[in-house]
Structure formats: C-alpha cells, structure tokens
Amino acid sequence: MSQQVIIFDTTLRDGEQALQASLSVKEKIQIAMALERMGVDVMEVGFPVSSPGDFESVQTIARQIKNSRVCGLARCVDKDIDVAAEALRVAEAFRIHVFLATSTLHIESKLKRSFDEVLEMAIRSVKRARNYTDDVEFSCEDAGRTPIDNLCRVVEAAINAGATTINIPDTVGYTTPNQFGGIITTLYDRVPNIDKAIISVHCHDDLGMAVGNSIAAVQAGARQVEGTLNGIGERAGNTSLEEVIMAIKVRQDIMNVHTNINHQEIFRTSQIVSQLCNMPIPANKAIVGSNAFAHSSGIHQDGVLKNRENYEIMSPQTIGLKDVQLNLTSRSGRAAVKHRMEGMGYKEQDYNLDNLYAAFLKLADKKGQVFDYDLEALAFINKQQEEPEHFSLDYFSVQSGSSIMATASVKLICGEEEKAEAATGNGPVDAVYQAINRITGYPIELVKYQLTAKGQGRDALGQVDIVVSYNGRRFHGVGLATDIVESSAKAMVHVLNNIWRSQQVEKEKQRLQQSKHQNNQETV
C-alpha cells in the first residue's frame, strides 16, 4: 500500500513575500478557502509576530478553515512562539513552525553564535512550542549548505525535544537532485530517532531545480513537501506544488506514494492565486500554463486526434480543465481544420475542405491563431483580413478623475454610416465600452480583459486582449497603442468586426439553405 505525502502549502506566507503589495485579509481568506477545497493537508498562512496585520489575517483564517491544518511561522524566539500560538489557538487544528539557521555561513555571519548555542536555542524553542500544541515543525534553515554531521545532530535534538515534523529546506536553491536526495537518505541512515518524526522538504528554485529536488527527496523517504501554487516566492520562487502533485500522480510506476489532493481543483486554485496576487502564469508553465495542453504542430495535432495519449501524459480534465481545443495556426494540418469544423456541427459536404484549407493557411500566416468564427467566414463567405472592416474607430474622448464619473464620447464608422454616442462608466475604459455598446446595440458581455506592456519607458505600447460573450459565443479582440484607453477601444472594435463577420456567415448559411430547399422543391 502506498504511503501519503503530506502537502504543505506556504503560498500565503513564503509566496506572499514575492508580492509588490500585501494581500488584504479578504484576499487571503479567498486563497485559503481555495486551498482547503483543493485538499492541502497543511497551510502556512503567515508570520504572526511580524505585524498586527499578519496576526489578524492568521487568526481570521484560523477561524474559517475546518478541513486543513493551519500553520504559523515563528523564529526561535519566545515572543514569536507565544504570539503564533495566540493567533492559531482558535483553529480546529494548528501547527507551530519554528525555524533556525544551521549552516556555518548563517550561524557565523548572521546569528553570530556557536553551533552549540544554536543547538540549545532549537531545543528550547521546540519545547516551548510543545507547550501549546502536539504538532510542532522545526526547520533547519539553509540545510542544503549545512555540514551533514551538524545537520544530523540538530535533527536528532529537535526530535528529542518534541518536534513531530523536521523540515529540510534548500533555502537558496543550491543543491542538485542527487545531492538533496542523498541528504535525506543520510538523515534516515544516521539519525537514530528519525522514525519519530515526518521528514519534510522546502526547496527554492534559484537554479531551476526545486521540483526535481523535492521529487528526489520523496523518493529518498521524505513524506511532506512544502511549496506554493504556481511556484511563487522570493527570488526565483518556491517548489510549484501543482507540479509535484501531478508528478506523484502521473509517475505512480516509480513512486509508491500518493497525496490527498482533489486534483480537479488544481487549475481553479492556480487561477485564483494568479489573479489575487497579480502574478500572471507563464504560457509554458507546466500543468497550469495556457500552453500546457496546447498542440499547434500539424503532426502533433494529428496524433492527438487519433489518440490523446500520443502527446499528452495526463488529461486536462484531471486538473479541472474542460476539453482543450487544438490551436489552429499556420502549422495546423487539414485534419485539425476538419476536426474543428466537425466540432461546430458541419459535415464535409457543407463546405469545400480544399478551398477552406487553402484560405485558412493564408489567414493563419497573417494573424497567427485562427478562431471558430474565422473558419466559418472562410468556409461560407471567404472573408479575409485584408478586406475593409465594417467597423472602424473614428475618434474617442474621455473625461475622468478622482471626483468625477468617467465619461466617454465615441464615434464609429459603421459601414457607410457614422455614429456617435456618449456614456458614463466605472472608469474611462468602461465608459468607452458603454458608448460603443450604445452605438451598436450588441448585447456584449466582457469576459476577459488583459493588458500587456510591449516595450519599456514612456513610449511603451499597451496591448489589450479581450474576450467577450455575444449570443452564447465568445469572440476575441486585440488592440495596440501607447494609450491604454485607445488600445482598449481598438480591441473592442476588433471584436465588433469579428461579430459582424459571424452575422454575415449566418445570413449566407440561411441563403444557401433556402436555395437548397428551393431547388429540392423544383426537383419534386
């Protein structure tokens, strides 16, 4: 029977240290609740003695969480431990996590003490924490650079003092997987009371090896892994918990361990952390990046259509994603285009695949990714990007400030007509969008808005990517300008033209259907 690996999340403590602005208590609660739904065993939610705000947030979260153990950090200082206990005592179950540097470098240059003094501090602090709870974790800060003899001594002493979890951090991301796994093996071989505590690891990603080191430690016997969602944290970040969790699940053939994580909550929790922490997830991020299950190569797309396991070692549904569509680009083959048309309900006799694919390649070379409504336009009205747009932005102006409601005036050229409207909104961008909606009358709902800086300095461009919902379908738009409001307006105009083309497609489909019906009647 496989053993459990405890998942210890420190997004709200170590992860928050990477943020430019602290999270509010409300935001921390949102993340804590998401982590609880995901099934983390332990969540470290703050450093209570560090500030009144941190104390309040730890205490508030401790009251709310029922199914995960809540943990607070403390130095080997009496006040730290007492304050942590006070903040945590309202929890259903809690842990006090005390830490102390053990490497020669830290002891001599930071603590300016002897190793024997450090050993005594560790023993005294673990015993003090045990006065408040039976669940005490002791961390050997900078364990990766601690002489192994000293590390074995402090681990044995901390366990004798009452520590139930011993954490071995690679604080500066210095070790390699072979080396780090060897440290864990040595502890099991040389510490006589090691069986009385759970060995935990906490790895940083300075050399890009945090996940590799954590997996090596698990294979060597560690039964708790600490990390953060999306790998956020100081410097290069922490171990990405979602990567460790899925590695354990996918590679059951070489790791006879499991976690108690609800895997289908991984993607949603990752998105919540990303949005609330204002830290975008790189597209190529393992497990949760937007490209993690994307296939653009024609060879790969063909293989996936035949059997997803050809190029996917896990299904997107496992982490809570719905079925991921293939990205249609200039590298996509005929099979992918045909598959997408079938997904929209079209049969091959409804269109000419040869003509569609030729037109698709021309369009894909110009715009990159091709969407469903683009394919329909190519199949039924053969509209290309170089044709004049139905909607274009003539001008806009906005008035906004801290004491006035944002107001926008917008003039669009709609085919042969010029139309202008004014509207108020929650900020200048919203005001512009409200004015555009008045002009078109389209019942548009904004689903996604993303701003990305292109370049640096005063002349940097702002690229706005939006997704809107219109009559049950989603349409994409992009705008680029040095002015954010202008790029936002251009993105919406791009959306309007995509919607307009889809309307022309529907009209053409109706015309073809009526013509076919009429021909059938004449034949009869």
UniProtKB/Swiss-Prot annotation:
Residues 5-267 form the Pyruvate carboxyltransferase domain. SMART domains: LeuA_dimer (SM00917). Its main location: cytoplasm. GO terms for cellular component: cytosol. Its cofactor is Mn(2+). It is an enzyme of class 2 (transferase). Residues 392-524 are annotated as: Regulatory domain. GO terms for molecular function: 2-isopropylmalate synthase activity; acetyl-CoA C-acetyltransferase activity; manganese ion binding. Pathway: Amino-acid biosynthesis; L-leucine biosynthesis; L-leucine from 3-methyl-2-oxobutanoate: step 1/4. Its EC number is 2.3.3.13. One of its GO terms (biological process) is L-leucine biosynthetic process. It is found in: Cytoplasm. Catalyzes the condensation of the acetyl group of acetyl-CoA with 3-methyl-2-oxobutanoate (2-ketoisovalerate) to form 3-carboxy-3-hydroxy-4-methylpentanoate (2-isopropylmalate). SUPFAM superfamilies: 2-isopropylmalate synthase LeuA, allosteric (dimerisation) domain, Aldolase. The gene is leuA. This is 2-isopropylmalate synthase. The keyword Transferase applies. Keywords: Amino-acid biosynthesis, Branched-chain amino acid biosynthesis, Cytoplasm, Leucine biosynthesis, Manganese, Metal-binding, Transferase. InterPro entries: 2-IPM_HCS-like, 2-isopropylmalate_synth_dimer, AIPM/Hcit_synth_CS, Aldolase_TIM, LeuA/HCS_post-cat, LeuA_allosteric_dom_sf, LeuA_bact_synth, PYR_CT. Belongs to the alpha-IPM synthase/homocitrate synthase family. LeuA type 1 subfamily.
